Amino acid sequence: MKRYRGWAVLLIVAVSGCASHMGSSESAGLRSPSDAAAIRAVFDMTTAGWNRGELPVYLSAYTESATAMGRNGPERGVNAIGDQMRAGYWKTGRPAQQLHYEHLEIRPLGPDNALATGQYVLTGGGLPNRTGWFTTIWTRTPAGWRMIHDHSS
């Protein structure tokens, strides 16, 4: 019986540690709470750039060697990602629809990396609304937080 009690205590401690980790704030593990805010600011900047028809502003969130996983498989490099965006979401040099994000959640992957998940929503342009979910991996660079991988579906 004592042997089982020891295992029960160990199990409770382990579960408590997992529960406290799962309930941590989005900025825990990053260098400062402002890091999560900085990543959110990049999302805001890219949304504004997209909606103004400035694809280079949208693409500035990616590192040069970023990868993006879309319905046609992986694209490597920011230029290929730009080509993918132009082919699937732009018409005559402008976005076919307006972009916004919902359910954005940022979780730390250490002091210099983060995971962002959420939903993108494309509306307007006389087209049916399009929406999907994404996971992006971010890294701290000298230029600020940038995406190294984007998986959208």
PLM-predicted stretches and their roles:
Residues 18-60, 64:
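Short, low-complexity N-terminal intrinsically disordered segments enriched in polar/charged residues
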Residues 21, 131-153:
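Short beta-strand edge/turn micro-motifs at domain boundaries
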